[in-house]
Amino acid sequence: IIIDGGSSDQTLQLIKKYSTRVKCLISEKDNGIYDALNKGVKLATGDIVGFIHSDDILASPQVISNIVNKFKGNTADIVYGDLLFVDREKPDIIHRFWHSGEFKKSKLRYGWAPPHPAFYIRRALYKKYGCFDLNFKIAADYDQMLRLLLVPYLQIIYVPEVFVKMRLGGESTKLNNALLSTKEIIAIMRKHNINWQVAILTRKLSKLWQIFSKFKRSNIS
């Protein structure tokens, strides 16, 4: 399923080259990225839902099959992995390594969350807990993940594998959106009864660790 925001470049022509592999294409103006994601969720018919944004790259051809096998083998509700922030022009150059780590509910109090592009869930959870809140323009994915991760009985599986390479320069990584992103994250933390003063600080520190982990990962490689 491809949701396009009414592109005026060569996007649609490129998609047509792969028309036999595209189940559904919508190209129309929307109310932002989360409106587009909500459209995709409503059109989905499979058991598992995940998202790949236009600048994202699956880390390997085996990523999707590995995710599906985890759902099958563990009757999981949520499966998530790791993510690499890479150079926009040269995606082999790593800028940050987002190592998610094993899930512990206590980590949510410190601003922890897995990377949304590496977060796959059963479609039934959208029906039960809702889609993305369009009141948030940049951080609705964080709100949606918290909504699910705080549910006590869901089976959540971490896969220590890079699922996605994200090119730097997305909406939430642009400088002019940094203040709005922080404002929304604080509002979301308050909504979910998380001490935002502590969580925002530890969240910022975790980004420094991601940069350090990049060098550590490079040395291992």
Predicted features along the sequence, with ranges:
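A generic membrane alpha-helix/interface feature
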Residues: A140, E171, I185-A187, I211
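Membrane-proximal basic amphipathic "stem/tether" segments
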Residues: R190-S221
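Charged/polar, solvent-exposed surface patches and flexible loops
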Residues: Q13, K17, N69, A187, ...
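Nucleotide-sugar donor-binding/catalytic module of glycosyltransferases
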Residues: I1-N177, K216
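Catalytic core of nucleotide-sugar-dependent glycosyltransferases
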Residues: V162, K174-A199
